[in-house]
Regions:
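Hydrophobic, regular-secondary-structure patches
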Residues: 5-85, 92-95, 127-128, 175
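A hydrophobic alpha-helix feature that marks transmembrane segments and, especially
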Residues: 1-3
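Mid-to-C-terminal secondary-structure elements
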Residues: 87, 92-107, 111, 115-176
């Protein structure tokens, strides 16, 4: 009984940053040959797979989104900089992951559609970049690997999520 409760507690703790009614699907490799094709072929996920998921499974899928990550990105404002990962996300990312916007807003549908160069940064990142100059981050432009992004939101998670992530529109990161 004690071990069972421990496992349940560990699962609840590890999933506290994620909606319990969500799943993640990752690309991979085939394990069996099929129709004359060899095993070990790479399975790629494309944008139309996301659209098809919502279209063909409306009774089971409330919403679908995708993420893409670009790691080790230097983000700077003036002389200050941090090294973070840019996460390209859909607006519904906050329905699945517990990212709480403390100031400003999160990525929205217009940002995604228009491939806007907007960014949502962690409060710790904002403190590093803007703290010395006492500049209000919302509306300012930061440089991320030579691309200027306008800060539209600040998030402040208390969970295990790293402060080393910033969020931009999925479509924007795909085009860079």
């Amino acid at each position: 009984l004690g071990a069972g409760n421990g496992i349940i507690h560990a699962f609840e703790q590890s999933s506290s940053e994620r909606a319990l009614n969500s799943i993640r699907i990752f690309p991979g490799w085939t394990s069996k040959p099929y129709a004359g094709l060899k095993e070990g072929r790479r399975v790629r996920l494309e944008n139309n797979d996301l659209e098809a998921t919502e279209k063909y499974f409306p009774d089971y899928v409330i919403s679908a989104g995708a993420t893409v990550r670009q790691s080790n990105v230097n983000v700077s404002f003036g002389q200050e900089y941090v090294n973070i990962s840019l996460m390209g996300v859909h607006p519904n990312y906050t329905e699945v992951e517990t990212v709480k916007t403390a100031d400003g807003r999160f990525v929205n549908q217009n940002d995604l559609k228009e491939r806007r160069k907007v960014i949502v940064i962690h409060k710790k990142t904002a403190d590093i970049l803007f703290g010395k100059t006492h500049t209000e981050p919302i509306g300012q432009f930061v440089n991320a690997s030579g691309v200027a992004y306008q800060v539209v939101g600040i998030y402040n998670d208390q969970g295990d999520r790293e402060a080393s992530e910033a969020y931009i529109p999925f479509s924007t990161l795909q085009t860079i």
